[in-house]
Amino acid sequence: MAFLKKSLFLVLFLGIVSLSICEEEKREGEEEEKQEEENEELSEEELRERRAWLDKLKSIGKVVGKVAIGVAKNLLNPQ
């Protein structure tokens, strides 16, 4: 009878340990998913910021180009 009790105890113990390991792996997987989602959100925010900077640079480039053309016209055709 003692042998059966020890065997049953061992089986239950191993089952609990394996269950605990599975739950830990599940938690780690969920944490990784959350981190990936946060990284995607950050990359979307970074893309928005980059687009805003590119739009500003484009506007500045247009203004500088117009000024350069005006200066070149005045230098080539003085009146």
Curated annotation (Swiss-Prot):
Signal peptide coordinates: 1-22
Gene Ontology biological process: defense response to bacterium
Tissue-specificity statement: Expressed by the skin glands.
Keyword Signal part of the UniProt annotation: yes
GO CC terms: extracellular region
Domain of life: Eukaryota
Annotated S-S bridges: none
InterPro entries: Frog_antimicrobial_propeptide, FSAP
One Pfam match: FSAP_sig_propep
Broad class of the protein's primary localization: secreted
Maturation-removed propeptide residues: 23-49
Keyword Signal: yes
Subcellular location, record wording: Secreted
Keywords in alphabetical order: Amphibian defense peptide, Antibiotic, Antimicrobial, Cleavage on pair of basic residues, Secreted, Signal
Function noted in UniProt: Has antibacterial activity.
UniProt similarity note: Belongs to the frog skin active peptide (FSAP) family. Dermaseptin subfamily.
Protein name, UniProt field: Raniseptin-3
Species, as recorded: Boana raniceps
